[in-house]
């Protein structure tokens, strides 16, 4: 009897073990990265690299509906992937529509780039963004900091754009009701 229980115990313990569920919010980024890994990019230190970096800086320095319409398809490759922590998009057309909607809901959107670093074909842009939203805190500037990972194609267009920033501080803390709850949660940590 005891021997039978000893044999049964490991089986019972194994049956009771659960595998934790992993909610992988990074999977779309990893999928986009994998499909854009072997794409020929820019030569480090080249004029094409310098121009691609300047195009990106100009695009985000003072976004308007007109500038977005004129520049998005020069800045982003047709098959580009973008995730700004608020939304994930594929394709320059979808990215253009998203940025147009963004600037329509804002009084102004400007970014100042403080640093750019390159490693293995990945470019990291450290920035400060000032946003004045029409409906959230009208008339007030919301300043946030972040880093954007960019991978360029051979024409200097963005293939991959992944933002790393605190979207709760940049947007959600300013939504009536929601902002109070988020600030309360943050205060408990």
Per-segment meaning from a language model:
Residues 116-123, 151-158:
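A short, structured loop/turn motif at beta-sheet edges
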Residues 108-111, 142-148:
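Short, surface-exposed coil-to-beta transition loops
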Residues 16-70, 74:
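Short, low-complexity N-terminal intrinsically disordered segments enriched in polar/charged residues
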Residues 4-14:
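Bacterial N-terminal signal peptides
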Residues 131-135, 150-154:
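Beta-strand elements of well-folded, non-transmembrane domains
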Residues 23-37, 160-189:
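Low-complexity, intrinsically disordered terminal/linker segments enriched in charged
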Residues 121-131:
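A short hydrophobic beta-strand element
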Residues 69-120:
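A solvent-exposed, acidic/Ser-Thr-rich amphipathic alpha-helical stretch
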């Amino acid at each position: 009897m005891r021997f039978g229980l000893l044999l049964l115990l490991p089986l019972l313990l194994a049956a009771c073990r659960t595998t934790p569920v992993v909610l992988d919010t990074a999977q779309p980024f990893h999928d986009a990265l994998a499909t854009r890994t072997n794409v020929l990019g820019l030569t480090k230190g080249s004029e094409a690299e310098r121009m691609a970096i300047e195009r990106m800086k100009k695009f985000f320095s003072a976004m308007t509906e007109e500038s977005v319409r004129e520049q998005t398809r020069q800045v982003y490759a047709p098959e580009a992937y973008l995730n700004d922590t608020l939304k994930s998009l594929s394709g320059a057309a979808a990215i253009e529509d998203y940025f147009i909607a963004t600037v329509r809901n804002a009084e102004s959107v400007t970014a100042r780039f403080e640093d750019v670093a390159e490693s293995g074909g990945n470019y990291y842009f450290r920035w400060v963004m000032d946003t004045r939203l029409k409906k959230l805190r009208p008339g007030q500037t919301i300043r946030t900091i972040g880093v954007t990972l960019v991978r360029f194609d051979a024409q200097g267009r963005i293939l991959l754009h992944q933002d790393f920033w605190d979207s709760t501080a940049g947007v959600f803390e300013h939504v009536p009701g929601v902002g109070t709850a988020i600030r309360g949660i943050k205060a408990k940590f």
